C-alpha cells in the first residue's frame, strides 16, 4: 500500500524566491520551538473534535490569517488522493516562482520520460592502435552530464588504460562535450549567484575534467606525449570504459539536499532524450510542456525556464504542482522512485531540522522551496 493518502502542496511564499544553493548546509543543531513545527503540530481543542476534512480546512484558515502571511503571496491546494478530489483551495491558479519546488516538476518529468532504470553515463574511448605498450592515437572522454562523476570513476578510466598494457600515449586527450549546448548558465539566473557549472563533463562538480585526467595519468606512471583539446568522438573509436550512476542516486541528492547541479543534469537528460543534439533547455521545456498537457492543463499558462528553480523566469501554480504529484501517485513507476527521494520531516535532507513535533516528524515527505 502506498504510504501517503494526502499530499499537501503547494504553499508558495514570494520571499525567499531563489532556489536553494547546491552547497546549502543543513545545520546540525537543536531545533526547539521552530515556527513551522509549532504551527503544524499545535492542534486546538476545537480542531480535534471537527470531522475530517473540516478540521484540515479550519486549521489552514487559521494559519493563513497569521502574521506570517500578511505580506506574502500564497498559492495553496490540498488534495485527498483517496477521494481523488481537492479539499482546500486558495489562490491555486496564481502564478508564482516555484524556487526549488521546480525540482519536483523536473523529477516527475524525468522519471516519466526516461524511466526509473535510466543511467547517467560517462565513457572513455580511443582511436589508433597499441604497439609495444604505446598507444599511437587519441583518447576521448565523452560527457553524459553525470553530476556524481568523481575520483573513483576517473581512477577506473586510468586502470582501463593500464589493463591494455599501455604505458605511453602519443596523441591527444579530447573532451567530447557534444551532449549539450555551450550554455554555461540557465536563462534567468543571477550572474552573482553560486550557480552550478552546466558542463556535460565534470569531475567532483568542477569543470576541470581533462586537466585532472592528464595529471592522474602521469601520476599513475603513464607517459603522456599529448595535448588536451575538445572534439567529438569519431564513429570508429573503440570504447573501453563506461561509468554510470543510477536515476535513484541522482534523485536522492537532487531532492533530499535540493542540489541544483543534479537538477540541471536531470533537466538536460530530459532534453537529450528527444534525440536533438546538442541537448538544450528548449528541448527539455518542450517535454515538460507535453506532460503538462497530458495531465489536462494548459502549458501556455506557465513559464518553465530551468530544471532547478534558480531562474527568476519560472512561473507555475499550486494547482500544476499538485496535479503533477497526483499523476506521479497514480503511476507506480514514478511514485516508486520519487517518494523515497523526498526529504522526511524531522529526519533528513532539507527538512531534518524542521517539523520535528510529534504529529509531523517522520510523517511528512515534502520538497522545500
Positions of predicted regions on the chain:
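Active-site SXXK
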Residues: 84, 98-116, 173, 212-217, ...
Amino acid at each position: 500500500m502506498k504510504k501517503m493518502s494526502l499530499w499537501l502542496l503547494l504553499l508558495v511564499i514570494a520571499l525567499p524566491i531563489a532556489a536553494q544553493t547546491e552547497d546549502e548546509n543543513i545545520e546540525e543543531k537543536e531545533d526547539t520551538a521552530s515556527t513551522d513545527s509549532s504551527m503544524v503540530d499545535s492542534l486546538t481543542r476545537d480542531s480535534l473534535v471537527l470531522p475530517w476534512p473540516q478540521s484540515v480546512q479550519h486549521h489552514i484558515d487559521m494559519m493563513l490569517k497569521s502574521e506570517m502571511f500578511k505580506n506574502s503571496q500564497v498559492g495553496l491546494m490540498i488534495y485527498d488522493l483517496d477521494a481523488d478530489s481537492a479539499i482546500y483551495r486558495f489562490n491555486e491558479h496564481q502564478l508564482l516562482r516555484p524556487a526549488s519546488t521546480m525540482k519536483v516538476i523536473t523529477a516527475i518529468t524525468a522519471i516519466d520520460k526516461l524511466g526509473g532504470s535510466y543511467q547517467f553515463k560517462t565513457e572513455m574511448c580511443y582511436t589508433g592502435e597499441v604497439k609495444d605498450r604505446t598507444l599511437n592515437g587519441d583518447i576521448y572522454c565523452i560527457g553524459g552530464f553525470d553530476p556524481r562523476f568523481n575520483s573513483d570513476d576517473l581512477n577506473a578510466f586510468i586502470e582501463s588504460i593500464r589493463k591494455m598494457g599501455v604505458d605511453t600515449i602519443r596523441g591527444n586527450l579530447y573532451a567530447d562535450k557534444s551532449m549539450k549546448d555551450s550554455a554555461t548558465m540557465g536563462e534567468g539566473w543571477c550572474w552573482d549567484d553560486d550557480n552550478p557549472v552546466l558542463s556535460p563533463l565534470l569531475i567532483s562538480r568542477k569543470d576541470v575534467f581533462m586537466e585532472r585526467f592528464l595529471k592522474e595519468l602521469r601520476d599513475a606512471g603513464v607517459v603522456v606525449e599529448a595535448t588536451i583539446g575538445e572534439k567529438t568522438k569519431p564513429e570508429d573509436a573503440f570504447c573501453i570504459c563506461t561509468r554510470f550512476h543510477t536515476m535513484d542516486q541522482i534523485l536522492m541528492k537532487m531532492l533530499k539536499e535540493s542540489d541544483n547541479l543534479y537538477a540541471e543534469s536531470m533537466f538536460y537528460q530530459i532534453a537529450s532524450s528527444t534525440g536533438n543534439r546538442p541537448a538544450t533547455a528548449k528541448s527539455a521545456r518542450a517535454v515538460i510542456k507535453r506532460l503538462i498537457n497530458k495531465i489536462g492543463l494548459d502549458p501556455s499558462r506557465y513559464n518553465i525556464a530551468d530544471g532547478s528553480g534558480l531562474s527568476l523566469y519560472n512561473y507555475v501554480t499550486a494547482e500544476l504542482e499538485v496535479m503533477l504529484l497526483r499523476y506521479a501517485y497514480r503511476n507506480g513507476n514514478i511514485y516508486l522512485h520519487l517518494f523515497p527521494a523526498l526529504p522526511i520531516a524531522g529526519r533528513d535532507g532539507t527538512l531534518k531540522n524542521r517539523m520535528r513535533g510529534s504529529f509531523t516528524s517522520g510523517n511528512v515527505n515534502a520538497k522545500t522551496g
